[in-house]
Amino acid sequence: MIEEEVLKIIKPTEEDKKGIEKVLEIIRERLNKLDFEVEGSFRKGTWLRQDTDIDVFVFYPKDVGKEYLERNALNDIINRIKDLDYTLAYAEHPYVIVNINNVEVDIVPALRVESGDKAITAVDRTPFHTKYVTSHLDERGKDEVRLLKRFMKGIGVYGAELKVQGFSGYATELLIIYYGNFRKVLEEASKWKHPIKIELTKPMKIFSEPLIIPDPVDPKRNVTAAVSLKNIATFSIAAKYYLKNPSIEFFFPSKKVEEKVKGDVLILRLNLDEKSSEDIVWGQIKRSVNKIERALKQYGFRVIDVQAWGDTNNITIAVQLESKNIGQYYLNIGPQYYSETIEDFIQKNDNIWVGEDGRLYSIKERKEYDAETIAKKNIVLKVKYNIESYWLQNTEDQQIMKFLRKTPTWLK
């Protein structure tokens, strides 16, 4: 059976666990006498082999406030691990990523609160998530979560960060708790039609997102608020096709694809000079993608697709047009002859005539008709960056090939 094959690949071995424990021993020594806990998928037993990020939360009394976490707590943590390979990262507040033996450990300062619904920062709920999941999943349930995570990774809908807008690890755990197993999740997801409500607890507010899973530890929060409609639809379609024809391709899609260039494709390569929060950068990139598409359409280009990919330092924006060539002049459609606005139209336009339909027309010159210039002008990054741009002729870049192909390998 496909699932059993996949599980053999993704389920950690005893050796894997020992390797993680050795890393944790180093962290425990450094954080000695602090109030800390191991959280996340490792603690819950739902982690995937060779895909391990350990979450360690250092708790401080809630009375010290959020500002204390950003300054005092962070400095205290850095002083304890400063001789290790570490970097600063940013979410709601800064935290530290330590790399030990190729294992990333996120050390996150948080406030110790009485319950999940009393959270002051988003991470304060985490220990309550851990308790909820570990009390509702047995060993088989943990394996079912692993299968669901790998399936979502394979089809590209895993990860709640803004760059992906997909399902978080916690969301996958709740789906298994609610439906019972991997196959049952797929059976139900294949029938989804938004808005979808999955209630392990009664919500404490009205949610407007397409997929609603009220957080069992804080019912005022929707666990899947970040999941885009695109990713919900992708997951539903993938579930339907997997149930019809199970294949390992859903879990581990083919990396090498080939596709010819259709239309005209502009590639923009951005290299960021400054480090910034991933969510901040990708918020600006997503706004840039939308702005580029809107501007090109406004100037008369027929846009096939605009997408972006990369990390926080190197980003590619690909713009696919039916054609990059567009006329310098265009037909401007005016009002009907009886409209009160005809005088204004006549005053503002040249080359005016009355059409067979009784409507006024004119010829107008486009303010801009170079697609590359328009695209560059509509990048809204607030950090400094260098840009390289070119029109695609051919490529061996697999990300660009994926963009050109469109169809996921699991679909066809």
Swiss-Prot record:
Annotated EC: 2.7.7.72
Keyword rRNA-binding: no
Something else known: A single active site specifically recognizes both ATP and CTP and is responsible for their addition.
Residues annotated to bind Mg(2+): 53, 55, 106
Binding residue positions for CTP: 41, 44, 129, 149, 158
Substrates-to-products reaction catalysed: a tRNA precursor + 2 CTP + ATP = a tRNA with a 3' CCA end + 3 diphosphate; a tRNA with a 3' CCA end + 2 CTP + ATP = a tRNA with a 3' CCACCA end + 3 diphosphate
Cofactor annotation: Mg(2+)
InterPro entries: CAA_C, CCA-adding_arc, CCA_tRNA_nucleotrans_2, NT_2-5OAS_ClassI-CCAase, NT_sf, NuclTrfase_I-like_C, Polymerase_NTP_transf_dom, tRNA_NucTransf2
Pfam families (alphabetical): CAA_C, NTP_transf_2, tRNA_NucTransf2
One of the GO BP terms on file: tRNA 3'-terminal CCA addition
Gene Ontology molecular function terms on file: ATP binding; CCA tRNA nucleotidyltransferase activity; magnesium ion binding; tRNA binding
Leader peptide range in chain numbering: none
Taxonomic superkingdom: Archaea
Function description: Catalyzes the addition and repair of the essential 3'-terminal CCA sequence in tRNAs without using a nucleic acid template. Adds these three nucleotides in the order of C, C, and A to the tRNA nucleotide-73, using CTP and ATP as substrates and producing inorganic pyrophosphate. tRNA 3'-terminal CCA addition is required both for tRNA processing and repair. Also involved in tRNA surveillance by mediating tandem CCA addition to generate a CCACCA at the 3' terminus of unstable tRNAs. While stable tRNAs receive only 3'-terminal CCA, unstable tRNAs are marked with CCACCA and rapidly degraded.
Quaternary structure and partners: Homodimer.
CDD domains linked: NT_2-5OAS_ClassI-CCAase
Name recorded for this polypeptide: CCA-adding enzyme
Record key words, sorted: ATP-binding, Magnesium, Metal-binding, Nucleotide-binding, Nucleotidyltransferase, RNA repair, RNA-binding, Transferase, tRNA processing
Positions annotated to bind ATP: 41, 44, 129, 149, 158
Claim: Flavoprotein is one of the keywords in the record: no
Family: Belongs to the tRNA nucleotidyltransferase/poly(A) polymerase family. Archaeal CCA-adding enzyme subfamily.
